[in-house]
Amino acid sequence: METRELWVLAAALAVSLLYYLAALMRYAGGGCSRSSRPPLPPGPTPLPLIGNLLSLRGVLHHRLASLARVHGPVMALRLGLTTAVVVSSRDAAAEAFTKHDRRLAARVVPDSNRAHGFSDRSIIWLPSSDPRWKALRGIQATHLFSPRGLAAVRSVRESKVRDIVAYFRSRAGEEVVFGEAIYSGVLNLVSSSFFSVNMAGVGSEEAHGLRELVEDLVEAIAKPNVSDLFPFLRQLDLQGLRRRTEERMARAFGILDGIIDRRLANRTHGDRHGDFLDALLDLVSEGKMARDHVTIMLFEVFGAGSDTMSVSLEWAMAELLRNPRAMRKARAELEDAAAVVEESDAARLPYLQAVVKEAMRLHPVGPILLPHRAVEDGVEIGGYAVPRGAMVIFNAWAIMRDPAAWERPDEFVPERFMETTTAIDFRGKEYEYLPFGSGRRLCPGLPLAERVVPFVLASLLRAFEWRLPDGVSAEDLDVSERFNTANVLAVPLKVVPVIVN
């Protein structure tokens, strides 16, 4: 680091210390007595300047859950100059979403996500009170993820799932890295459904390269950033993360803009595909949507959707291989139901649906929901005050293993979703189960995921018997987790597909 930057950093740290001391004085005294307002949540004692950052080393959702066992299900942390409130139980989550959903519906935007103006045009990061967010949410609900829209391209999805099965058939008897093959197949499913383009062949080097680009971009976005801890340092971009994100986003947007440009050229000659991209470009021509919003929306679907569904499938397969009884039960249900699986069959396979739900409960792809931000005073959770401007973190991984809500919470028991008297679905209305979030910020891609993940899993279980490589037993299978923004297997799953007659 150059001498000038060291001086700037030293000055920034001095200013940070003043902020920190001012905060201590404000909470110690302040304009009203302690008895007149709820207390802040308990939490580990913060260090000057850095707060509790050193307490968060390791797998983040595991570490937060461990701290919550000491300090309680509503816990306060200090992250640089930011106050964070961590919610780790069903009851606390229910109170937050039922009483304060609107007040907590804003986002904490990481500085790297401001690259290319992404956060100002993204449904992920725009405040829910922003008219642009409401308009984009309506477009997604009407044109991308509506039952009618998804039904219109069902045959495309079924064709791409057959391609996935065909790839594994070509590798029958061989050791295959499951996640890489599934990612390629799901990538094609998403790209073909939304803009009628095969991004890559299943298992191809091109798909691997695209995934590396997305993962590199996600890593840059997820990396701890001093600009987020001390916002007045943003302009300096001391770690270069915004510059790195700018470069990766430019490459990703370039790929998508090329697809859009080719489609626009074809449309001038009357060539239409009738897919989601055509629907979005119709809105652009009608003045109801900006062209750059089309690129952003495709980027969100392409980047987040492909990875989320493929990781969910890898976890489901890993848990079935670890639990041979559950594997036999799932395959028996399929053998009794259909010789060839179609997408509509998956909804009529209750045990398969339970397997998917249980895998997502134990290993949510997003174990920590994207941070919310309190936009008003008066938010209270579990008897504790959430200050205006505070970051609110929902540890979905801990909530979905809350022993007050689940029996044997750390075990893979799909039957729990069949035995309950109240149906538990993916929509976050039962606050012990939040794989896609809840409230205003419920994941908009849920309607696609709840069709694709069970359908792909059913197709693979019907077509093959699945084995682990020689020398690996079910008991030895490593299902430890690694997390940056997605919760993936620390050791990629390797499988051997065996064709079923």
From Swiss-Prot:
Keyword Lipid biosynthesis: no
Pfam families (UniProt xref): p450 (PF00067)
Cofactor: heme
Induction line: Up-regulated by methyl jasmonate.
Keywords: Heme, Iron, Membrane, Metal-binding, Monooxygenase, Oxidoreductase, Plant defense, Transmembrane, Transmembrane helix
Gene3D superfamilies given in the database record: Cytochrome P450
First-listed, main subcellular location of the protein, grouped into a coarse class: membrane
Family: Belongs to the cytochrome P450 family.
Task of the protein: Enzyme of the diterpenoid metabolism involved in the biosynthesis of the oryzalexin class of phytoalexins. Hydroxylates ent-sandaracopimaradien.
Protein name, entry field: Cytochrome P450 76M5
Annotated organism of origin: Oryza sativa subsp. japonica
Gene: CYP76M5
